[in-house]
Every structure is written in structure tokens, then in C-alpha cells.
Regions:
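Catalytic cores of DNA base-excision repair glycosylases
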Residues: 1-207, 235-249
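Intrinsically disordered, low-complexity terminal tails and inter-domain linkers enriched
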Residues: 208-252
Length: 255
């Protein structure tokens, strides 16, 4: 896969060090940016990084740490309730089970998919706005609903790519196949894409591929040149900083 060649170890840009911290970050990320969530969790986690510690803060106390994030009051309420359930039913551990995850307040199918994939390495697909757009534009898995796209992606994508496909598609949608101004001239799969609204630099890139001047699928370069001649690197693997994995999960609405 070209996406794997460009980014062998894709990750989310949300910062976390345990499955519980990831759960908190993903719940907070709904209708919020990853940058905003990371700023909040950098304040929160040094003070409270377990379900018991979060509950001890209370809704008002937790809200103070996350008030820079949209819908922070409802998120604080959901997180307190979810933490109580984790402590009472799961020994304060995040379950690696879809039904148990979706039973937690504030956790729906998409959030559960992120946790199962990112924390536990399961081949799930959390379809957010980026994945939905890429799947429909490229023709990889066209669908009218999130669930339809999710099911088609899992059916279409070969097994060896499924665990990482979630992050590849999100990163591609966020940095290249953007909603308003897709960077088709920098796209490493432009010649495979069925999108009729390709921006003109894609034509040059597609011609290069058809003439054999671009690497094959399995050995695609990590960068491409835009129309201006500047090299645009495809999003590299996110660095690890301070013991925390910097990852970016796609925040859409809380499921």
C-alpha cells in the first residue's frame, strides 16, 4: 500500500499513556480539536489519571480542567458517570469489549471503535468526517451513512492493512484530501481516486505515475512535489514525547 509506505506506523495525535487516558481523550475530542484536547489533558492527567481520581474531582472540579473544550459540562457529567461504572464493574480497567464500552456514558460506536483499534489493536474502523469523505471521494467504500461506509471498508480493505487503515485514512483526509481544498497534486493515490472534482495538479501527478516515473504501490516515496515545486511530505509517524504517544483521533460528535 502506498499509504503504508508513506507512513508505516500511523498513530493518532491525541496524547495518552494508558487505555483509560485514551478513553478520556476520545470522549473529550467530540466536536473539539485534538490540539485543544491535548492542552486540557496536559493539565488534567498530572492531577487525575484514574477513574477514582476523576470521580474525586466531581463534575465541577473536572469541568474546571476541561472548560476550554466545547460541551465541557456534558462531557464532565458523562466522564464522571463512566468512571463510576469502570470502578464498579470493571475494576477500573477499560474493557476490550464493544458492548461493555458502548454501555459507558458518552461512549458510542465510533468512540468504542477508536478505543478497540488504538488501545487494543483490533481491526475496527471509526468512521469520522475525514474517513467518510475519503471513502466516498476515492470510491474505496462509497456510502450514505457512517455505518455503511464502515462495513464496506472492513470488507474491502485486505486483512493485513485493517488495523492501521483507520489512522491512514484519517491522516490522509486531514492533511491531503481536505474538504474545501483537496491537495490532489500532493496525493499519493490520485491516480486511483474516482473524485471528479480533482484539483488540477493531480493531472501532472497521475501522468507521472502512468509514465512509470513514480514508485510502485509498495515503494512509494514519502514525499511528493506540489505544483509550486515544493516537497510536501505525507504525514510522518507521530513522535513519542514524554512517555506519551501523540496521536490524533478524529473527533466528530460523541456517538
Amino acid at each position: 500500500s502506498r499509504l503504508r509506505a508513506a507512513n508505516p506506523h500511523p498513530t493518532t495525535e491525541l496524547e495518552y499513556s494508558t487505555p483509560f487516558e485514551l478513553l478520556v481523550a476520545v470522549v473529550l475530542s467530540a466536536q473539539s480539536t485534538d490540539k485543544g484536547v491535548n492542552l486540557a489533558t496536559r493539565r488534567l492527567f498530572p492531577v487525575a489519571r484514574t477513574p477514582e481520581a476523576i470521580v474525586a474531582l466531581g463534575e465541577a472540579g473536572l469541568a474546571d480542567f476541561i472548560k476550554t473544550i466545547g460541551l465541557y459540562r456534558s462531557k464532565a457529567r458523562h466522564l464522571i458517570a463512566a468512571c463510576r461504572m469502570l470502578a464498579e464493574l470493571h475494576g477500573s480497567q477499560v474493557p476490550a469489549d464493544r458492548a461493555a464500552l458502548e454501555a459507558l456514558p458518552g461512549v458510542g460506536r465510533k468512540t468504542a471503535n477508536v478505543i478497540l483499534n488504538t488501545a487494543f489493536g483490533q481491526p475496527t474502523m471509526a468512521v469520522d468526517t475525514h474517513i467518510f469523505r475519503v471513502a466516498n471521494r476515492t470510491g474505496l467504500a462509497p456510502g450514505k451513512t457512517v455505518l455503511e461506509v464502515e462495513r464496506k471498508l472492513l470488507k474491502t480493505i485486505p486483512a493485513e492493512f485493517r488495523v492501521d487503515a483507520h489512522h491512514w485514512l484519517i491522516l490522509h483526509g486531514r492533511y491531503v484530501c481536505q474538504a474545501r481544498k483537496p491537495k490532489c497534486g500532493e496525493c499519493i493515490i490520485a491516480d486511483l481516486c474516482e473524485y471528479k472534482g480533482k484539483t488540477w495538479p493531480a493531472t501532472e501527478e497521475m501522468n507521472k505515475r502512468s509514465n512509470g516515473s513514480t514508485a510502485s504501490d509498495g515503494a512509494t516515496s514519502h514525499s511528493t512535489k506540489s505544483a509550486s515545486g515544493q516537497v510536501a511530505a505525507y504525514p510522518p509517524p507521530s513522535p513519542r514525547t514524554g512517555g506519551k504517544t501523540k496521536r490524533r483521533a478524529t473527533p466528530a460528535k460523541t456517538d
